[in-house]
């Protein structure tokens, strides 16, 4: 079995989501769908490694100010299709990022307030048919985690497996916390550490809430305009 974790200099939380079984006996293809944090610090050798891995499309979910602060290393690369598809803009972030009690509440806010953007992102994933695709945000946990969860749901991966995949982020982001810790004011360290946590129950609660509100994840996807045709395209491209 291929290694799920791809360890490259200058990037955190880079993982292949291949290998997961679906409820109908298929599996997510390896080397088709990757997830990660931001790419601005990739070394030249790491950029070449991703090229050699076959990467041809990048979907960057970050906001405009994030792009200014940390430009994407592949934004102008030849042979790479770069799509900046933010889940919300700098203004909308004030509503989406308003204080919440739990991570699940944050994700449900995304589910409710970012429907046009989620539709665009999932439609773009469905269009990539023949080479690895990388979805990323800042640390590859929240925005990326939700997009990957909805994609895996569309493919027929069971909720508990989706929650397990989401939960892997914390172990991959702990080195980021260790690296940044000296520069973080002591009074903000607990908040930063909480930001990189990825408890599996947060994704379990999110998927359960979608089921409660919409009847099923499939119904929610239909609300987004991700109907049978796009689902079949996703399955054809990403399953074996």
Identify the residue ranges that each predicted region occupies.
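Ser/Thr-glycine-rich phosphate-binding loops at phosphate-binding pockets of nucleotides
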Residues: 139, 143-144
């Amino acid at each position: 079995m291929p290694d799920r974790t791809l360890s490259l200099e200058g990037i955190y939380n880079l993982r292949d989501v291949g290998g997961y079984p679906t409820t109908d006996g298929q599996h997510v293809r390896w080397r088709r769908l990757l997830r990660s944090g931001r790419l601005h610090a990739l070394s030249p050798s790491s950029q070449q490694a991703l090229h050699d891995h076959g990467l041809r499309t990048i979907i960057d979910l970050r906001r405009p100010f994030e792009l200014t602060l940390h430009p994407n290393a592949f934004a102008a690369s030849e042979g790479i299709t770069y799509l900046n598809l933010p889940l919300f803009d700098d203004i909308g972030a004030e509503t989406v990022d308003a204080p919440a009690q739990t991570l699940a509440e944050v994700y449900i806010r995304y589910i409710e307030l970012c429907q046009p953007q989620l539709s665009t992102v999932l439609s773009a994933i469905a269009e990539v048919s023949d080479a690895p695709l990388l979805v990323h945000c800042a640390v590859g946990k929240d925005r990326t985690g939700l997009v990957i969860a909805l994609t895996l749901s569309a493919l027929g991966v069971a909720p508990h497996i989706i929650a397990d995949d989401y939960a892997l982020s914390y172990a991959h982001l702990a080195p980021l916390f260790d690296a940044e810790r000296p520069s973080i004011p002591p009074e903000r360290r607990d908040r930063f550490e909480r930001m990189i946590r990825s408890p599996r129950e947060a994704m379990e609660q999110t998927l359960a809430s979608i089921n409660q509100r919409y009847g099923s994840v499939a119904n929610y996807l239909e609300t987004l305009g991700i109907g049978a045709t796009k689902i079949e395209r996703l399955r054809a491209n990403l399953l074996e």
